[in-house]
């Protein structure tokens, strides 16, 4: 009954809010997820305990809780609980690990005396029949000795449920009472015959459990975590605060203007790379505290115990509604995890406090009511976040993603902007609000940094940054994380998380202010790319079956019994087609080294970082490819050298000092050192024989000798490849035949020009391995100047070939093998002094059309993207890499992107002859589809006019500050303790603009407000912002075009940035500077200092240390 009433209330409220347009112009309603099938009662809480001595026990199941009638609950109110109330009050004030503040009267740590008057009465009945299976899923097979926390997500098909569970190791104090009395209380209170006794043995999943209780399920997307929880959510810590204060990472730009934005992304890539080891998380997130701070712990008496908390969302039967909620859940996972941590803190407090109560029935009443209160808050927060009306078209994101209607957007925005300047700037209200937003939401700073081209071009092309796009491809990070950090303004140093709330009874006015602010709250636009089949496989193609595992919960024949059904169904996987026979005959010997990549994973996501760049072991797949077989005349000789392979014994060979160049697979550098007979016998004889016989990787010459395992022993995972026995022999024979034919060709053609063939056979979609070919030989200076360059780039695959054109007749002798070599950009440039890559400064940021070039007898195979079945070269944009990818509209072009553009021009101007031959590379037949307006943080956390205050939203409006006053302090503390960005946060900030009182205040987690009438400190209006508003107003009154006025606005913002640069340069080397000195020397007024200091913190962290 109660949930139904709440549902009606919420639906009514949500409907009223949804009818409100998110901005004054009458257009389509603001989008929100459909919540008609999603109710508060669909969110279920399950708490489990696993103890060495007692086994597994259900500590709480919200489905087993029923609210008792007031009359039946009247007797229980008269029991005195004064003594325990004092104990609980002390424990709530001393428990610092919880995120809920005990200062607020409604908090979970309130006194029991207060609870005595308002404590709702609940009856805890027998838990549902599926708790045993769910408990098995929650705990899994993690050992009791494991100290860290584990996070899992399960999707149960029937009935449709999504379960997120977190398992903590419990820490207990030995002198503060036993935790067993709570479970004993449940057994005591459930001796009621109608409710049924809660038999401990029945729900004890300890050593005496039966096979029928075992459950099996396949986790979705996020397997159980190791000590570091960051891997699963994809939202990990970026830099710690200390790392932002040290010398910044050099960006590709000569200017350090974007160092913080660029550096955050680069450090993010480093932090989330498994190659750099596991970063331990904060201990408060790893453990579940059952001890008060005043209790001492006796290690001899503490037994191992784990607490598991699980939130289960019951989904609608309709697939579209399920898909909507899953989209919402996985895209907003950091917010779910943050609120789950808050719920965990409430459960910790409830468990600690209820132990002080001696009477069993009261203990359970207190515990259950506290957990139901915490669950109610969790339910309300998630439901509001799901159903809140969003701003349909945020100005900045729409302007950056929609170029066709940019003029109309500029006109509409400018009209609303001028209205606010003229009507709302009473008491400098609007100037104060804009000052606060520009001071704390700092993602606008990288968008106004200076660029080399004219301002009109700068404004129209500001939506992308080539250098950051290049970084996203070579050192991937989660784009949702980057977007969330931009929105919260977590760019400066120290890192601050900022939210803005506009309060007012005038709905239209609040909506107008929210709409205008979406121009200044900037973030990256995201584009979602998905792979799909393109056409049916031809008869020459290999068709292999992958496996799809479906888990369902079915009703059993016995009453109240359920069991798990695991269905394994076959579905076709993306496979590479076999090359046409005619094409294959013209090719050089078939290459035989490749790294196996699991489906849907880009190799650049597997840990390619500027440090320790290495290639995967070559023996990982029976189907192989390599690069750079060289056919040549037999009168001179080449020897491979400089090979690096990924091996623990050879880690020191990996490059340590390097730039952000992508990892490379380098074909051996070769010099004319040995005579022809020695090389021919060494390469063509022994080595090729060994390759044909066992198909193992060639050992590195300079690493420890080891016997590589034969390829037949490779284990093939579900959907990864076909059986090696099916095709191994035929491929080996075919390779031998081609090698023999190649040998005959060497002997017959003494004067033939050399040719090189780059082949790649790729069995999995999404391979992003990067190859660089580097042929080095002793040549004359004129040869050095005649070296050409071919850059072929598609879908993360790069083959850069340098060759000497003038002396090709001297290039001869067979090059029979090529191996992967890890090399960074800096080392590559050092090692190619003889043949220099002209203009090569790193990976190009745009694709060069892939063509086969035949020049001086040199044949280079072109990449045909995705193995198009028709054989046509479909040269797609490189932006179609099949994964979520950040266009990074929040980052402007860097100063030095001219060198990247020069590289592109060089690549496009490379001469190509008309007789170039196209050779199709065998890549999966698939096509990429892109969705620009995916429902991400940028469009989800910028909300409209809401019925109540919301803690997660970056921007929203509401009619009253009543709930804001109650919750704000606890929310700010929680944000610092459990930040959604998963990195240390120095300060949490909330900007509160009240249109009824015309005040703008800033509340922070660091300063306590002494005035009870105020929520925070008043904002000091910046003279820079005031003059900006006046100049825009004057230009508008002169009837200048809207886009010109917007350009002027951008110029004024850039002027603020340049003043902050000037301030940082002046303060360099100083320890203390007086404000009057700054005013006289730099012309900076005192009311501008907070704004300019905040801007300077994005590029010069020392400024804040000097001035603050």
From Swiss-Prot:
Reported consequences of knocking out the gene: Mice lacking both Fnip1 and Fnip2 show enlarged polycystic kidneys.
Positions where Phosphoserine occurs in the chain: 212, 217, 720-721, 723
Q: After translation, how is this protein modified?
A: Phosphorylated by AMPK.
The molecular function GO annotations come to: ATPase inhibitor activity; protein-folding chaperone binding
Listed GO cellular component terms?
cytoplasm; FNIP-folliculin RagC/D GAP; lysosomal membrane
Query: Where in the cell?
Result: Lysosome membrane; Cytoplasm
Instruction: Say if the entry is tagged with keyword Coiled coil.
Output: no
Q: Where would I find the dDENN FNIP1/2-type domain in this sequence?
A: 1044-1099
Q: Where is the composition biased (Polar residues)?
A: 652-663
Q: How does it assemble?
A: Homodimer and homomultimer. Heterodimer and heteromultimer with FNIP1. Interacts (via C-terminus) with FLCN (via C-terminus). Phosphorylated FLCN is preferentially bound. Component of the lysosomal folliculin complex (LFC), composed of FLCN, FNIP1 (or FNIP2), RagA/RRAGA or RagB/RRAGB GDP-bound, RagC/RRAGC or RagD/RRAGD GTP-bound, and Ragulator. Interacts with PRKAA1, PRKAB1 and PRKAG1 subunits of 5'-AMP-activated protein kinase. Interacts with HSP70, HSP90AA1, STIP1, PTGES3, CDC37, BRAF, GCR and CDK4.
Protein name as it appears in the record: Folliculin-interacting protein 2
Q: Which organism is it from?
A: Mus musculus
Q: Which gene encodes it?
A: Fnip2
């Amino acid at each position: 009954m109660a949930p139904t009433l709440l549902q009606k209330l919420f639906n009514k409220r949500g409907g009223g809010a949804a009818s409100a347009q998110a901005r004054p112009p009458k257009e389509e309603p603001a989008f929100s997820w459909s919540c008609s099938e999603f109710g508060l009662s669909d969110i279920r809480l399950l708490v489990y305990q696993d103890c060495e001595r007692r086994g597994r026990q259900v500590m709480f199941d919200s489905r087993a809780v029923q609210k008792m009638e007031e009359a039946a609950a009247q007797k229980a109110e008269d029991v005195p609980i004064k003594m325990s109330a004092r104990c609980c009050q002390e424990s709530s004030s001393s428990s610092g690990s919880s995120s809920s503040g005990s200062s607020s009267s409604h908090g979970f740590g309130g006194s029991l005396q207060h609870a005595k008057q308002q404590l709702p009465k609940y009856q805890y009945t027998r838990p549902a029949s599926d708790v045993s299976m769910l408990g098995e899923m929650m705990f899994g097979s993690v050992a009791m000795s494991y100290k860290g926390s584990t996070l899992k997500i399960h999707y149960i098909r029937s009935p449709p449920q999504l379960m997120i569970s977190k398992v903590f190791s419990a820490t207990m104090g030995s002198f503060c009472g036993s935790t067993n009395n709570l479970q004993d209380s449940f057994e005591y209170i459930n001796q009621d015959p109608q409710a049924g006794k809660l038999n401990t043995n029945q729900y004890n999943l300890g050593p005496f459990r039966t096979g029928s209780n075992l459950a099996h399920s396949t986790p979705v997307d996020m397997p159980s975590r190791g000590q570091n929880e960051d891997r699963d959510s994809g939202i990990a810590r970026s830099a710690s605060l200390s790392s932002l204060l040290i010398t910044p990472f050099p960006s590709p730009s000569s200017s350090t203007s974007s160092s913080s934005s660029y550096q955050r992304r680069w450090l993010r890539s480093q932090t989330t790379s498994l190659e750099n080891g596991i970063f331990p998380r904060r201990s408060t997130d790893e453990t579940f505290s059952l001890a008060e701070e005043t209790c001492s712990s006796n290690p001899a008496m503490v037994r191992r115990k784990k607490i598991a908390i699980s939130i289960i969302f019951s989904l609608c039967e309709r697939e579209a509604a399920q898909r909507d909620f899953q989209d919402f859940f996985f895209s907003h996972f950091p917010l779910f995890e943050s609120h789950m941590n808050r719920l965990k803190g409430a459960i910790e407090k409830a468990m600690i406090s209820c132990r002080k109560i001696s009477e069993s029935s009261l203990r359970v009443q207190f515990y259950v009511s506290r957990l139901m209160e915490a669950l109610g808050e969790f339910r309300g927060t998630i439901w509001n976040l799901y159903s809140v009306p969003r701003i349909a078209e945020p100005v900045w994101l729409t302007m950056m993603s929609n170029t066709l209607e940019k003029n109309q957007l500029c006109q509409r925005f400018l009209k609303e902007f001028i209205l606010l300047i003229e009507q709302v700037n009473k008491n400098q209200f609007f100037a104060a609000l804009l000052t606060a937003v520009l001071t704390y939401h700092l993602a606008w700073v990288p968008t106004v940094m200076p660029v080399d081209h004219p301002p009109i071009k700068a404004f129209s092309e500001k939506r992308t940054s080539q250098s950051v796009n290049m970084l996203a491809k070579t050192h991937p990070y989660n784009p949702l994380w980057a977007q969330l950090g931009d929105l919260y303004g977590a760019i400066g140093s120290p890192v601050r998380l900022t939210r803005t709330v506009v309060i007012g009874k005038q709905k239209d006015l609040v909506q107008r202010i929210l709409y205008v602010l979406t121009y200044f709250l900037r973030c990256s636009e995201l584009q979602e790319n998905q792979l799909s089949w393109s056409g049916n496989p031809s008869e020459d193609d290999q068709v292999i079956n992958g496996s799809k595992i479906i888990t369902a919960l079915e009703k059993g024949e016995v009453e109240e019994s359920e069991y798990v059904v695991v269905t394994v169904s076959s579905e076709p996987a993306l496979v590479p087609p076999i090359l046409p026979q005619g094409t294959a005959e013209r090719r050089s010997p078939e290459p035989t080294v490749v790294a196996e990549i699991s489906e849907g994973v880009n190799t650049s996501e597997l840990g390619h970082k500027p440090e320790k760049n290495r290639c995967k072991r070559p023996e990982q797949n029976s189907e192989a490819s390599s690069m750079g077989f060289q056919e040549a005349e037999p009168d001179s000789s080449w020897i491979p050298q400089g090979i690096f392979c990924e091996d623990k014994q050879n880690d020191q060979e990996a490059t340590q000092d390097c730039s952000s160049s992508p990892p490379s697979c380098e074909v051996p550098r070769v010099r004319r050192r040995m005579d022809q007979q020695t090389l021919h016998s060494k390469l063509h004889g022994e080595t090729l024989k060994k390759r044909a016989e066992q198909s193992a990787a060639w050992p590195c010459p300079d690493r420890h000798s080891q016997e590589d395992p034969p390829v037949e022993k490779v284990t093939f995972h579900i959907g990864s490849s076909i059986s090696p026995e099916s095709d191994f022999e035929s491929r080996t024979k075919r390779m031998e035949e081609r090698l023999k034919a190649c040998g005959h060709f060497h002997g017959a053609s003494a004067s033939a020009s050399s040719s090189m063939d780059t082949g790649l056979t790729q069995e999995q979609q999404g391979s992003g391995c990067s190859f660089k070919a580097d042929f080095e030989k002793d040549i004359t200076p004129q040869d050095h100047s005649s070296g050409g360059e071919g850059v072929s780039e598609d879908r993360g695959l790069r083959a850069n070939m340098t060759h000497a054109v003038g002396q090709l007749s001297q290039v001869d002798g067979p090059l029979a093998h090529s191996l992967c070599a890890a090399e960074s950009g800096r080392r590559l440039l050092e090692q190619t002094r003889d043949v220099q890559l002209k203009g090569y400064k790193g990976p190009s940021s745009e694709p060069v059309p892939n063509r086969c070039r035949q020049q001086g007898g040199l044949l280079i195979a072109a990449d045909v993207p995705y193995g198009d079945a028709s054989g046509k070269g479909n040269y797609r944009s490189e932006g179609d890499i099949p994964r979520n990818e950040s266009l990074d509209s929040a980052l402007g072009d860097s100063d030095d992107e001219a060198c990247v553009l020069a590289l592109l021009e060089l690549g496009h101007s490379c001469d190509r002859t008309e007789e170039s031959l196209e050779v199709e590379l065998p890549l999966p037949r698939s096509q990429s589809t892109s969705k620009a307006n995916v429902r991400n943080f940028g469009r989800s956390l910028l909300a409209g006019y809401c019925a109540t205050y919301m803690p997660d939203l970056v921007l929203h409006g509401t009619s009253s500050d009543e709930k804001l006053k109650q919750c704000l302090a606890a929310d700010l503390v929680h944000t610092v303790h459990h930040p959604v960005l998963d990195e240390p946060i120095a300060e949490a900030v909330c900007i509160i603009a009240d249109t009824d009182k015309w005040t703008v205040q800033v509340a922070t987690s660091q300063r306590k407000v002494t005035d009870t009438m105020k929520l925070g400190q008043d904002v000091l209006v910046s003279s820079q912002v005031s003059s900006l508003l006046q100049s825009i107003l004057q230009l508008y009154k002169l009837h200048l075009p809207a886009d010109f006025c917007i350009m002027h606005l951008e110029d004024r913002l850039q002027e603020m940035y340049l003043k902050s640069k000037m301030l940082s340069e002046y303060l360099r080397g100083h320890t203390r500077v007086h404000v009057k000195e700054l005013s006289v020397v730099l012309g900076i007024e005192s009311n501008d200092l907070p704004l300019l200091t905040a801007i300077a913190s994005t590029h010069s962290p020392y400024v804040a240390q000097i001035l603050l």
